[in-house]
Amino acid sequence: MVDETPSLGRAEEEIQGPGARLSRRRFVAVGGLSGIAALLAACGGSSTPTTAAPTANLSAPKPTALPQLSPVASGTPAPAAQATPAAAATIGKLVLNSDPYPKYTGTPKDSDTLTMIRGGEDLSDLNPDALNSYSPYTFVYDPLLWMDEFTLNPAPWLASKWEVSADGKSYTYTLRNDIKWHDGTPLTADDVAFSMIVYRDDPESAVARFFPLMKQDPTVVDPPTVRFDLSDTSGDWVLNASNQFMLQKKQLGDYYNAGHGQNGAKTLKGFPYEQQMLIGTGPWKQVKYSPGSAPPYLQYQRNENYFQNAPHFNQMIFKTIDQSSSRLTAWLNNETDLLWPVTATDVDQVKNQDGWLYSEHALAFMCSWINFKNAKQAHPEFLNDKAVRQALSTGIDRKGYSDAIFKGFVDETKVGSIAFSWAYDTDLKNPTYDQAKAQQMLSDAGYKTDSSGKLLGKDGKPVTLDAIVANTNQYPVDKIAVSVQEDLRKLGIEMQIETLDPATLKNRWQKTFDWDLWFYSRILFAGFSDYTYYHSAWDPRTNPQGRNAGGWKNTQADTLLDQIIRQPDLTKQKALLAQFQTIIADDMPALWYGFPDDLILVKKNLLGYQPNTGWQYWDSWKIWRTS
């Protein structure tokens, strides 16, 4: 994936059942190359395909990479190492695979239709910069730079190379000369410049936070070259801004510039998406958009000219179904070929039907944010006491919910939100569950229990907590809330749980602030982008754009955050992130619940599925049907 014009198509696939392939990229990571600079400079070779039985090694170490961004991205992949097959693990009739780079042997075959179902995607509006959904854009569009499916190492994609100025403030991208839009017109630097301006300026943009340093509009040097002159060095320009989808100016430019937004704001909201199908460069051409159907769906045709080789299906249908039970019914009735997200409880319901179950690292975390400024809390000093927060964390039985809810498909020991494999401080762990120790810690902090076991505040009245959680979640934090509720009850604390629709929840965390714990999960982008969730200047009580909903303030953390977002050297950024992780593990702006695995169901007659920690449906063009 580090060639100037990479090809990850059929010629490079190693094909049969999902196995323990040690791919080119995994070889680089496991082989200990010191980082992305070494990765990009690696010399190439060719791998020899091997045939192996499907495998799953649940205890196998995951590949990591220590990123050091090279100014120029070029080079050839390192050769692949051979993998030794291990015994296949199964859950009922499901064959389990946990390799980040599965191995397949055989010959891909073309088929008619691939069907994919996912929950929680809003297909009511296809504005590509609002990102109300995500899967549809991975089908139609491509980014400038590709992030490796596990390590997140950046590599050329639509751009054949990128260069960084000596002062670290200017980025120049050279586009491949063989990229065509679905209408046959060439991709140009004008399209790239337009896309980045939209992401920066559209009031609907979900990723405007990646572009505050792009105060100047991009410079189109010539048709294949575009330059971005930033106002300062950036810690996430390559990993986040450069990984956004490129939009066609010809299709969207006139509408955007006409200013259809409030007070004449330029926006892509309201574009006639039902009449005009999105035009991209990606593996699938959109041919139908039916947001009013039950369920809502999109239909695609294969892009025969896709630069990474055409998909192995003539068409693809993508549906979104919010109810988990309905999604499982569709799977059991063979109405879908892939299903994600899937919980461990879901697996119990479908394990007697043949299929592949991929258990893959998710670029995600789970927590309950702590509200330090709940005006309705009768004991506001309670959660503001760090000793109390640490006591509550010690009193949470994480292994209990790991076994009961996740069946082990989670690393509940992980602390914080830095779920990047290259940046997480592996020395940090959540405390081991110890109810007696937690009770003693609360007592030492001045909180005693009465004869009935209720924990009393310093005013002699029982301590109670109010928790909020969304009614739809990517990961089952609503069930974690129930588990934590029982743990806190053992400490003498009653916690009420309110399950809310998204609009009501947003009003509670952004405007009324009348809660104590917000149970939460989130999928991350490739680079650190949590500045507004932690920095004290981004408290939504004073900053409408802020996401520091609990009003946490830590001066040392603020200083580190200001350094992290301006540090382009990822080795140095990793060191800063390590310090930051130590702070949030100790000072606890949240109770941390670990990093979940993604579970993806794939029909037994499908091969070629490549997990992607950034979005598990991103590599859909690699899949084929065996029969």
Which functions belong to the PLM regions below?
Residues 1-22, 26-42:
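N-terminal secretory signal peptides
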Residues 33-40, 295-297, 302-304, 359-362, ...:
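Detector for C-terminal structural segments
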Residues 99-105, 118-135, 158, 185, ...:
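A structural "hinge/loop" feature
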Residues 122, 148-153, 245-310, 315, ...:
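Gly/Pro-rich hinge or "lid" segments in bacterial periplasmic/extracellular proteins
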Residues 176, 272, 302-349, 481-486, ...:
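Ligand-site clamp/hinge motif
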Residues 209-263:
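Surface-exposed binding/hinge segments that line
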